[in-house]
Every structure is written in C-alpha cells, then in structure tokens.
C-alpha cells in the first residue's frame, strides 16, 4: 500500500505515474489531499489519519515516509501504534542539506552528515542522534 498525500491536488507530483499505479491494481494507492477542490475523487484528510485508516500490517513490511517534519512525526507515532518497529520505519532528512558534499557542515547532526551518511535513515538510527534534525 502506498499512501500519498499533498496539500492540494495541484501539489501532487508524478501525476502520470500515480495514475498508472491506480489503473494497474498491482499496488493499493491511497491518494489524499488536505483540501479538495470540487470533484476530487479520492480521500480528503491528512496522511497520519490515512495511516490509521489503512492500518498497514507491520508483518513483512517497511514504511518509508518523507515530507514536512510535523507530518513525519505523526506518521511515525501512528506506525508505532500499529506495531511497526524502529527498524521498519525509514525517513529522509534532505531538508537539512545544503552543499550535498559534506563540506559546509549544515547537515551535521551528532557525528553524521546527512548528505554523506543518508539522507534516508531508519527511525532506529535517528533515535541514537541528538534531536537536532
């Protein structure tokens, strides 16, 4: 299952690819917007709410989340409520990057550089870092 949300339908990216996934039926896709315009055929609401409505089964599953930090925080909280472990949850921190080469130091958190050591990390790895991200 893929839960894909945006503020509005205009903010959705990869629209053609998402339409192909919706048609293909190989993967369940839940499209959601915070604010829907007239005629929006999919869900209206926030991604963390969708997580609790879809209730993905943590057995043989990983969760990958990206987006605004506040959304990630609540998605992770809901995944934990559903039984996902820290090793099954991954997120990205590219918002902290600037040069992308590890030279400017902007993305340094504890002893890692997000640009060089990530930008995708397990929740377990993030919990071992100072809460600077």
What is each PLM-predicted segment?
Residues 120-133:
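Short microdomains enriched in Cys/His and/or Lys/Arg
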Residues 18, 80, 113-115, 131:
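Alpha-helix termini
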Residues 75, 107-108, 132:
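Short alpha-helix boundary/capping motifs
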Residues 1-98:
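FNR/FR-type flavoprotein reductase catalytic core
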Residues 12, 101, 125:
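Short acidic, gly/pro-rich beta-turn/loop elements at beta-sheet edges
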Residues 70, 94-119:
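Local cysteine-cluster metal-coordination motifs and their immediate loop/turn environment
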């Amino acid at each position: 299952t893929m839960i894909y949300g945006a503020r509005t339908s205009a903010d959705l990216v990869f629209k053609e690819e998402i339409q192909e996934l919706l048609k293909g039926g190989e993967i369940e896709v839940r499209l959601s917007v915070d604010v829907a315009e007239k005629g929006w055929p999919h869900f209206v609401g926030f991604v963390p709410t969708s997580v609790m409505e879809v209730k993905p089964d943590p057995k043989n599953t990983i969760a990958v989340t990206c987006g605004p930090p506040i959304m990630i925080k609540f998605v992770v909280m809901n995944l934990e409520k559903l039984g996902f472990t820290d090793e099954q949850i991954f997120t990205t921190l590219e918002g902290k990057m600037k040069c992308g080469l590890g030279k400017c130091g902007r993305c340094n958190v504890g002893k890692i550089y997000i640009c060089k050591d990530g930008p995708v990390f397990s929740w377990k790895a993030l919990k071992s870092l100072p809460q600077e991200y």
